[in-house]
Amino acid sequence: MGQIPMPGGWSMAAMWLPVCGQSWLGAAAGFIGMWAAMMVPMMLPLAVAPLLNYRATLAGEGKAFLLTAIAGLAWAATWMASGLPVYLAGAAVARALLAMPALARMMPVLAAVAGVAGAAWHLAAWRRRPLHPGLPGPPVCAAALRHGACLGAHCVRRCSGLTVALLAAGIMERSTMVCAVVLVAAESVRLRER
């Protein structure tokens, strides 16, 4: 991923802006593809326990595996869809930073503050959030889609602080990704223990 040198001695990821000859729609589609390839597998451990609980409630149903798979796909689609507002916000910030060099010089400090605040919010909210939303009604495809989307929306909200910290620290930095994966894995283990 290319970098754009910015005032203040730091560089911004080029993924927030269309490259030469690319439309904004193409840039957004590229980002959402990258977002899906990165966030869905990283956050998947958090979906395992609720999906296993859902499958357990369908015990005795002939379509339990299929309905659980449909709920899992709806969960993944919700995470993919969450990439669009992230891209729109990132693109707006990137445009503002290119237009306002004074703001660009302050960005490393602002990113550090946002990263610490996002991580603190994630850790503080960790204990008080519910494990997962209530289970749906009759076991049909629409209910499985609705349940998976509800689980996905809950997971996106639950991980919003972590997402802010990840974006502030540099979404494509390996060390940042490793820290996020370790945190998600630890939270997944903790949720399964409850």
Per-range role (PLM):
Residues 124-162:
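Membrane-interfacial catalytic/cofactor-binding modules of polytopic membrane enzymes
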Residues 1-36, 94-106, 125-141:
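Histidine-/acidic- and/or cysteine-rich, low-complexity loops and terminal segments associated
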Residues 37, 47-53, 147-153, 159-168:
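Generic transmembrane alpha-helix signature in multi-pass membrane proteins
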Residues 23-31, 67, 71, 108-111, ...:
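Residue-level signature of transmembrane alpha-helical entry/exit and packing/kink sites
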Residues 35-38, 114-122, 184-188:
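Alpha-helical transmembrane segments of multi-pass membrane proteins
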Residues 1-3, 66-126:
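Membrane helix-loop-helix hairpins that form the core translocation module of multi-pass transporters
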Residues 23, 31-76:
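Juxtamembrane transmembrane-helix termini in multi-pass membrane transport proteins
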Residues 63-92, 158-193:
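A small-residue-rich subset of transmembrane alpha-helices
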